[in-house]
Amino acid sequence: MYQIITPLNLALNTGAGFICRTFDRDAAFIQGYMQEAQFHQGAALIEILQNCPIFNDGIFDPIIEKKNQAEKVLRLKHGEPLLFGENNEWTILLDRMEVKKVEAASLDQAQWWIHDETSKFKAHVLSQLGQGEYHDLPVAMGVIYKTPRKFIEKQYNDYNSILEQKINQ
């Protein structure tokens, strides 16, 4: 079986500095994410899960219908623990490179995974939740990865300045 190629992992592996996922019925969040992406320095990708009534009608309904969101959607907030469920009773545990769904109450709070949107490693893991080998876990929604990048023009100008200094020495 082939490994699933996702837009988020593709963006992570090609150097995008802002990576986010949301769904089409989440208008309030989409607007905020669009503004963040617009003002982000560097490449940005927002994956929007959206049904197509002709080719894949209802494909995301098991995830994004209100009655399923508590168990199927993991809302990401920088600096906050990854909790989900009707009463936030579940968490995601990263244990020796293995991702597990565990009862939050069974762990000391120090063991909870705190979302760090600057961690590229954790961003790779979060982008895979809800699919492939992690199909039984909730789908991560929100800013998955964010780090400022220099614009290519700035890098080019910095490089030219260094070259000019070396030539003029």
Range-by-range predicted roles:
Residues 54-169:
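Flexible, low-complexity linker and terminal segments
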Residues 17, 22, 40-47, 71-79:
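A conserved active-site cap/scaffold subdomain adjacent to cofactor or substrate pockets
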